Amino acid sequence: MAEVGKVLASDMELDHSNETKAVDDVVATTDKAEVIPVAVTRTETVVESLESTDCKELEKLVPHTVASQSEVDVASPVSEKAPKVSESSGALSLQSGSEGNSPFIREKVMEDGYNWRKYGQKLVKGNEFVRSYYRCTHPNCKAKKQLERSAGGQVVDTVYFGEHDHPKPLAGAVPINQDKRSDVFTAVSKGEQRIDIVSLIYKLCIVSYDIMFVEKTSGSSVQTLRQTEPPKIHGGLHVSVIPPADDVKTDISQSSRITGDNTHKDYNSPTAKRRKKGGNIELSPVERSTNDSRIVVHTQTLFDIVNDGYRWRKYGQKSVKGSPYPRSYYRCSSPGCPVKKHVERSSHDTKLLITTYEGKHDHDMPPGRVVTHNNMLDSEVDDKEGDANKTPQSSTLQSITKDQHVEDHLRKKTKTNGFEKSLDQGPVLDEKLKEEIKERSDANKDHAANHAKPEAKSDDKTTVCQEKAVGTLESEEQKPKTEPAQS
């Protein structure tokens, strides 16, 4: 029995040592500013070996010693220190997905109402206290502070650096560990219904991006958000703050005002688009009448281009079914002008040109453009174009040809009336003709000299033609004098 008692005592000592090691590991993992040595008193249990006791009494004695040993372990200073840490810091045990099931205890530093994050500690020479360094957890806040704690965990000295550029957080806010941004944090609230802030922000962003996500219910002016599922975000933040429905409405209205009046459309207006059952988009009659401003002009001309006062640029042409004439497409050459036109000739009347205008000009007619009337005859247009294209040489040649026609006409008159006139009247008429011819030739020479050009060959030809015409007239004047003598 003595040997059995020694074996049981040794087993109990091994179990007790394992339990104390586990407690030491838990204390080592805490985020405390200082490490306090823990003295663990181990009570040695002595099992009296009684040769006279029975096995049943020994079995009763062994559980009693084990229970007493566990009570001693629980009542040790280590177990008293653990609840003290939880009371002073009020930490939240958050389970990290990256570190498995190892507990992470965060120290609560909320005495001044702000959230702080510890980023270092050190032992100062000549100071018995451990100095800890903290910075504010608010983004871009430069406030810092230093704490000095005693061995018992009491704050001895606090020094602040910088000022906070933000208001104090709410009393129920949860301090988030910035080093564990990828972890999933949940707020512990008293019976409040938690909502996903990521989904709320997603909905508000969708409303500001496209107002189509806001729909009006029939018979009321209450605006409701379309139920859209936000993308699943790993590690989304859940908070216990639930905004009322009125706040959501004001956020929607403000976001629509920020985007401007152009993006905010009234989808109940008559000019809005309406969707058919088949899915095709149909424009309302109001919008169709405003956009379809067409003007059709009929012009009787043989030319395919009509001058309407504006400048056009051709950008296409195609054949029309049932018509042998193609259709040409033009757009106004003025920058930014939306006017277009297409021109085609009528298949029933070849002289009829049909011009269809689309849109309105947003500018004045360019200067130097003359509008031709639709009822103007093509012959008149041709005459004007011919007069504009005349040159000095062509005008002189035309005057010479006119003179030749006049001379031929006078010759015919003299031949027909020569027998009725007397012999004395013949020479008088011939002299008058000569004088008229000379005057016209002199006038033509003066005109040609005034409008002379480097090309001298044409002037020489005109003079040669004039000399020949004068020679022929003189030879013809001599013939009538001999004819009466022979008769």
Curated annotation (Swiss-Prot):
Which tissues and organs express this gene's product? Answer: Expressed to similar levels in root and flower, to a somewhat lower level in stem and to low levels in leaf and siliques.
Consequence of substituting Y315R: Impaired DNA-binding activity
List ligand-binding residues for Zn(2+): C136, C141, H164, H166, C332, C337, H361, H363
> Is Nucleotide-binding set as a keyword in this record?
no
Short sequence motif Nuclear localization signal: positions: 273-277
An example Gene Ontology biological process: positive regulation of DNA-templated transcription
User: What GO terms fall under cellular component here?
Assistant: mitochondrion; nucleus
InterPro entries in the cross-refs: WRKY_dom, WRKY_dom_sf, WRKY_plant
**Any Pfam family matching the protein:** WRKY
Could you list this entry's UniProt keywords, alphabetically sorted: Activator, DNA-binding, Metal-binding, Nucleus, Phosphoprotein, Repeat, Transcription, Transcription regulation, Zinc
Name the major location. Answer: nucleus
Query: Which residue intervals are annotated with compositional bias (Basic and acidic residues) in the record?
Result: 429-462, 476-487
Q: Which residues carry this modification: Phosphoserine?
A: S76
Any idea where this protein resides? Nucleus
What induces it, per record? Answer: By salicylic acid (SA).
MF-aspect GO terms: DNA binding; DNA-binding transcription factor activity; transcription cis-regulatory region binding; zinc ion binding
Which positions make up the DNA-binding region?
105-169, 301-366
Keyword Membrane recorded: no
Residue numbers spanned by region Disordered:
69-104, 255-287, 380-487
Effect noted on mutating Q317K = Reduced DNA-binding activity
Quote the function comment for this protein. Answer: Transcription factor. Binds to a 5'-CGTTGACCGAG-3' consensus core sequence which contains a W box, a frequently occurring elicitor-responsive cis-acting element.
Indicate the family of this protein.
Belongs to the WRKY group I family.
Q: Other remarks on record?
A: Binding to target DNA is mediated mainly by the C-terminal WRKY domain, while part of the activation domain is located between positions 210 and 285.
| Protein name listed in UniProt | WRKY transcription factor 1
Organism listed in the record: Arabidopsis thaliana (Mouse-ear cress)
* Record lineage: Eukaryota, Viridiplantae, Streptophyta, Embryophyta, Tracheophyta
